[in-house]
Amino acid sequence: MKKDLLKRTIFAALALAIFIPLLVIGGLWLQIAMGLLAMLGVHELLQMKGLNTMTPEGLLTLLATFALTIPLENYLTFLPVDGNVVAYGVVIFIMLGCTVFSKNYTIEDAVYPIAMSFYVGFGFNALVDARIAGLDKALLALCIVWATDSGA
């Protein structure tokens, strides 16, 4: 038990040493890091459910998460104001379209990856938006999460 706690503490300190400078720098580097972390989180959630991410369903889920996390309208200027939501919707439409044309892939199979990509992607998007609004707002959001997490 103590060994696991020590391992988690060391990993948290190492992650903070990498994450805090990225948060201070902000910009594209933070957005890419948040997108990769969101994809890692969805990968873990899919594995917990017994789903493989190296399938079309898993790859579309990772793409949907990344599309929702990153403010795409900053980089793809032809997209409307909520470009990441539009891109997310297109990927979800493809996933739901697969349920129509496949006998082995039902709507029940598609719901969990869609829900996880929305939940994780929107959460990381909120952190990216908070950082765009200012470092103080991003730190406040993180302190709230860390305070509630440490009490659990």
Where are the model-predicted features located?
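Membrane-embedded alpha-helical bundles of polytopic integral membrane proteins
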Residues: 2-152
